[in-house]
Structures are given as structure tokens and as C-alpha cells.
């Protein structure tokens, strides 16, 4: 049975026809520069608890997180206190996946912007159960897996090291090889990420929790999808008669690219009648698989600043005059038009290598037009704030 005290807060989440209590469900929220501890405590005391506060580990030290952030559930707090070195990796991973999110959405109206001095990191935009929230939960979970697995292989953590199962001989399409080197222990990264990240969602049984759990799993599995076999050849003149191989994670960009494609193909769902799973909102679409991102609510258009939706708007954003894609001025500026400014850029050019060990370049100036989206009319902006 779904938790009744979390009903009716989010009219945008639909449920399949059925019993009356399977109505609407609430939504969940989720880097900032270093700030003093008293301010952090005041900030946290005034912030709703329903968020992914662990995202803020990228901005604060592990000790402060463990002791003072109320958004962590007991299991997360226990893991944080027991494995402070892993929390350090989680913090570094948070910075990495946020950068990747911003790279993937750099040409979109919503550009994965973060809020300074806000431990929810993304603000109210994560309250809506949108495809943007689906992407953020997936890539954040993937980021934890990636960061912990990498730290294991680099010998930075007490609890793990290289994959202990990759020993002896094995075979691939090229023939037999010996396991050697240091295979990335991705299964440990997945297990810890699941235990830590999913802990909060498992405390409740509502629609948003199920959505988050599903998308968290998509993110974890995305990292594993891009494990690659790397080998070193042995033999006369490197003839590769013998090979030593190990499993290594690919660059995190591949995971980001993959999840971006999943974002574009995300499937809108509604809760089934007994509240234990999903069904597609539109019967003309296929059912979601374990590798699909799912969401409940349509996204706002992100055209104008809307504090209630967490939208910063697109006024002042740089756009591409000739593009017909999401970075094009027509799409990015939502039909409001754009301003053009001529600017002079200084770049390095005519670079030459000088013996030994120096590259010398000239500085060249060129003039380019920069197009930025116009602000909405005052009345239009006031309607959204």
C-alpha cells in the first residue's frame, strides 16, 4: 500500500484507473562553494527534507555531511560515517557528473544549472517528476559508481581494490588470455552506489520513489555497459601469442552520451492500480524496459524565469543563429528574438614547435557576432514569478 501521507501534493503525477487512494504523489528535489558551518546548519534547517541531499557532498566535507545534513536517512548516515574515504570519492564524483550533465545540456533551454548556496543543488526543478529529473537521478547514480570504482582501482579505498574475480585464464573472440593488471571492480561500485543512493527511496513507497529507483538503476547499469577489455601482447616482436588482459571503464563521457540518448527517448508512465509498478501513459508507446528512463510529468518549457518550477529562463543565453536544433536562436529564445553583439576574440595561432620542448604561438584577433536571447516582455515575466 502506498503511503497516504504523501498523497495529493503533486497533481501532475497520474495513476492508472483503480482504487481512490492511488491518486497523486509528491515530488522530490535534489554545487555550491564552500561556506561556513553555521550558515550550512541554518540553511539545512530551513530546507525541505524531501531531496537528494547527498548530491551536496561535492561541496562539503564528508564529516559535515555525516553529522549535520538532515536529508540523509539513517542508512546513508551510517555508510557515510563508516566509509569516510568512500564519501570523499562520492564528493569528487558529484562534481564530475554535474559537469557531465552541464555538458550534455549545454545547448538546451534547461542547461543543468546549479544554484549557489543551495544544498538541493538544482533547486525546485527537481520537484517535478520530469524527464530532466529522470536524467539527473540516472547520471548521479552513474557518477557514484564511476567514482567509487575508479578509487578502488587506484588503491585509494580501504574497503576495495582491483576486481578479485578476474584471475586465471579466460577466452574472448580472439582466443584465450590471462587475466592480469588491475580490472576495475565495478561490481563493488554498483553495490555501494545501490546501498547508499537507493537508501532514501526505499524508506517510502510512493510513485516518485519508484521512479527514482528505476532511473538510479539505469544509471548504474549504464557505467557497466561500457566496460572494455584492454590487453597487452607478449611474444616475439609483440606477436600477441600470449595476452594479458583486464577490464577497464570507458571515459565517463560515453555514459553521459548514452544517458542523453535515453533522455531523448524517455517514456512517460503512470502508476499501475496496486501501486507496485508502471504502465505507459500512452498505449501507443512500448512498455519501458530496465534500460529506459521513465518520468511522470511533462516538463515546463523553461522559456521564462519561473520560481515555482525552478526555471531560470533563457534570457541572455547564447544561441546559434543558423542552427535549427535546440541551440538555435528560434528554439532557445522561444520566439522572442535575439540581440547581436560584435566582440573581438584573442586566440593562439600559427603555433610552431621549437627544439627542444617548446611550442610558441602568436596571438590573433578575430571579430565575431555573438547572439543572445532577448528577455521576455515585463508582463510576461511577471506572470511566471
Swiss-Prot record:
Pfam families to which the protein is assigned, alphabetical: wnt (PF00110)
Descriptive protein name: Protein Wnt-2b
Organism: Gallus gallus (Chicken)
Lineage of producing organism: Eukaryota, Metazoa, Chordata, Craniata, Vertebrata
Molecular-function annotations in GO: cytokine activity; frizzled binding
Annotated localization: Secreted, Extracellular space, Extracellular matrix; Secreted
Family to which this protein belongs: Belongs to the Wnt family.
One Gene Ontology term, aspect cellular component: extracellular space
Subunit comment: Interacts with FZD4 and FZD5.
Organ and tissue specificity: Detected at the marginal tip of the developing retina. Expressed in the intermediate and the lateral plate mesoderm in the presumptive chick forelimb region. Expressed in the eye, head ectoderm, prospective forelimb mesenchyme, lung bud, pharyngeal arches, the brain and otic vesicle.
Function per UniProt: Ligand for members of the frizzled family of seven transmembrane receptors. Functions in the canonical Wnt/beta-catenin signaling pathway. Acts as an upstream regulator of FGF10 in the lateral plate mesoderm during limb initiation in the embryo.
One of the GO biological process terms: camera-type eye photoreceptor cell differentiation
Post-translational modification: Palmitoleoylation is required for efficient binding to frizzled receptors. Depalmitoleoylation leads to Wnt signaling pathway inhibition.
Glycosylation sites: 111
Highest taxon, organism lineage: Eukaryota
Gene this chain is encoded by: WNT2B
Sorted UniProt keywords: Developmental protein, Disulfide bond, Extracellular matrix, Glycoprotein, Lipoprotein, Secreted, Signal, Wnt signaling pathway
Signal peptide: 1-20
Disulfide bridge map: 101-112, 152-160, 162-182, 231-245, 233-240, 303-334, 319-329, 333-373, 349-364, 351-361, 356-357
Lipid-bearing positions (O-palmitoleoyl serine): 237
Amino acid at each position: 500500500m502506498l503511503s497516504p501521507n504523501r498523497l495529493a501534493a503533486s497533481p501532475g503525477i497520474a495513476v492508472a484507473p483503480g482504487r481512490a487512494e492511488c491518486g497523486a504523489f509528491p515530488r522530490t528535489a535534489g554545487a555550491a562553494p564552500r561556506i561556513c558551518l553555521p550558515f550550512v546548519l541554518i540553511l539545512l534547517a530551513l530546507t525541505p527534507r524531501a531531496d537528494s541531499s547527498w548530491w551536496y557532498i561535492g561541496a562539503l566535507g564528508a564529516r559535515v555531511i555525516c553529522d549535520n545534513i538532515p536529508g540523509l536517512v539513517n542508512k546513508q548516515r551510517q555508510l557515510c560515517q563508516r566509509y569516510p574515504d568512500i564519501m570523499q570519492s562520492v564528493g569528487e564524483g558529484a562534481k564530475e557528473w554535474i559537469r557531465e550533465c552541464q555538458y550534455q545540456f549545454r545547448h538546451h533551454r534547461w542547461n543543468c544549472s546549479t544554484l549557489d548556496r543551495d544544498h538541493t543543488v538544482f533547486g525546485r526543478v527537481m520537484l517535478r517528476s520530469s524527464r530532466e529529473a529522470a536524467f539527473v537521478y540516472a547520471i548521479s547514480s552513474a557518477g557514484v559508481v564511476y567514482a567509487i570504482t575508479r578509487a578502488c582501482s587506484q588503491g585509494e579505498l580501504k574497503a576495495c581494490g582491483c576486481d578479485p574475480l578476474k584471475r586465471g585464464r579466460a577466452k574472448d573472440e580472439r582466443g584465450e588470455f590471462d587475466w592480469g593488471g588491475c580490472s576495475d571492480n565495478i561490481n563493488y561500485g554498483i553495490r555501494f552506489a545501490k546501498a547508499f543512493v537507493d537508501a532514501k527511496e526505499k524508506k517510502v513507497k510512493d510513485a516518485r520513489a519508484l521512479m527514482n529507483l528505476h532511473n538510479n538503476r539505469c544509471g548504474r547499469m549504464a557505467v557497466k555497459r561500457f566496460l572494455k577489455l584492454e590487453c597487452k601482447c607478449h611474444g616475439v616482436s609483440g606477436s600477441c601469442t600470449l595476452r594479458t588482459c583486464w577490464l577497464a571503464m570507458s571515459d565517463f563521457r560515453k555514459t553521459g552520451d548514452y544517458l542523453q540518448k535515453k533522455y531523448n527517448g524517455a517514456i512517460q508512465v503512470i502508476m499501475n492500480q496496486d501501486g507496485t509498478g508502471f504502465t505507459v501513459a500512452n498505449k501507443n508507446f512500448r512498455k519501458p524496459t530496465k534500460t529506459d528512463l521513465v518520468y511522470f510529468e511533462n516538463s515546463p518549457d523553461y522559456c521564462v524565469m519561473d520560481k515555482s518550477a525552478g526555471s531560470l529562463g533563457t534570457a541572455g543565453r547564447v544561441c546559434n543563429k543558423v542552427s535549427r536544433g535546440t541551440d538555435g536562436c528560434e528554439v532557445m529564445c522561444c520566439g522572442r528574438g535575439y540581440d547581436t553583439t560584435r566582440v573581438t576574440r584573442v586566440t593562439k595561432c600559427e603555433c610552431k614547435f621549437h627544439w627542444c620542448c617548446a611550442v610558441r604561438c602568436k596571438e590573433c584577433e578575430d571579430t565575431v557576432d555573438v547572439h543572445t536571447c532577448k528577455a521576455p516582455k515585463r508582463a510576461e515575466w511577471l506572470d511566471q514569478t
